[in-house]
Design a protein with these regions (language model features):
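Short alpha-helix carrying the canonical HExxH Zn2+-binding catalytic motif
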Residues: 147-163
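N-terminal low-complexity, Pro/Thr-rich disordered segments
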Residues: 8-71, 183
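Auxiliary, metal-adjacent structural segments of Zn-dependent hydrolase domains
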Residues: 76-131, 190
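Post-HExxH zinc-binding segment in Zn-dependent metallohydrolases
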Residues: 182-209
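Catalytic Zn2+-binding segment of zinc metalloproteases
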Residues: 159-175
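Pan-zinc metallopeptidase signature
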Residues: 45-47, 51, 228-271
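Active-site scaffold of zinc-dependent metalloenzymes
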Residues: 115-149, 165
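Bacterial N-terminal signal peptides
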Residues: 1-7
Length: 271
């Protein structure tokens, strides 16, 4: 069963992110423990081991800058962000004693299909769980905006769907929507997407000094999402703007997966 999970918004050479900050190297050297299979069923979503792993590592992530109109600089930037995500989530999965594997990253200039089907309407990119690949669109519209934190947040959201796949959350989601009525399907989709917003924002907090993004810039990003985040998703499968903003704030403030359990949250907070 394959699902294409989307968010709105060639391989480039990239420098390996530095792990100079102590928390990353110390965690990486932690005692090796036997991995366990990801949980199954509702527990995978509501009580996942990732929720008990504490804050994400304080990672130095050197990305460089995006030049307006430059596809090459955009690919380099996004590839470096992806490498930082790989390192950060590998550390977190080790703490959860869960197996980890990196996703594939594919840059495309047209709306290609995948094993999950056609490119979803309104999406600037998407993650396909069937082949564990992130498809990132490189278009003129994207390249007009050189503001790195926006693109890093987008990448981190798509990567969060891969995290959900590895952690067993995606499997629970797939089984649930397969049996659900239309309105219930949308509710499940919102919980999945809003969790990805939260996890992506937790990552952004831990690399904010390097991107950089200060509190004023972050607040501006959240306000924009609050006012506009729902406009690409008329069926409300990603949540209202205020819901997206709420979960982004939770992730950024806590920098921990524990803040991102949308599966036990009230219906009002995932509307």
């Amino acid at each position: 069963l394959a699902f294409s999970l989307v968010t709105g918004v060639g391989t480039a050479n990239a420098a390996t992110p530095s792990t100079a900050k102590a928390s990353v190297t110390e965690t990486a050297k932690a005692s090796v423990t036997k991995e366990q299979a990801p949980p199954r069923g509702r527990t995978a979503a509501t009580a996942n081991p990732l929720y008990r792993t504490g804050t994400l590592p304080d990672l130095r992530c050197t990305t460089g800058q995006i030049r307006a109109g430059s596809a090459a600089s955009y690919k380099i930037f996004m590839t470096r962000v992806n490498r930082c995500l790989n390192l950060m989530w590998k550390t977190q999965f080790r703490k959860a004693k869960l197996p980890f594997a990196q996703p594939k990253l594919r840059f495309v200039t047209s709306r290609v299909s995948s094993p999950c089907g056609r490119w979803p309407s309104g999406a600037g990119g998407y993650y396909c769980s069937s082949n564990r690949t992130m498809y990132i669109g490189v278009t003129r519209a994207v390249l007009k905006n050189p503001y790195g934190p926006n693109h890093a947040q987008f990448m981190a959201h798509e990567y969060a769907h891969h995290v959900q796949q590895l952690a067993g959350i995606m499997n629970y989601y797939g089984q649930s929507v397969w049996r659900a009525r239309s309105s219930t399907k949308l509710a499940f989709s919102r919980r999945l997407e809003l969790q990805a917003d939260c996890l992506g924002s937790a990552f952004l907090r831990q690399v904010a000094d390097d991107l950089p993004v200060d509190q004023e810039q972050w607040d501006a990003m959240v306000r924009w999402v609050d006012e506009n985040g729902h406009k690409s998703w008329p069926t409300n499968d990603h949540g209202k703007g205020r819901s997206q903003a709420y979960w982004m704030e939770r992730g950024f403030n806590a920098a921990s997966p524990s803040a991102c359990n949308t599966w036990t949250a009230s219906s009002r907070s995932v509307a």
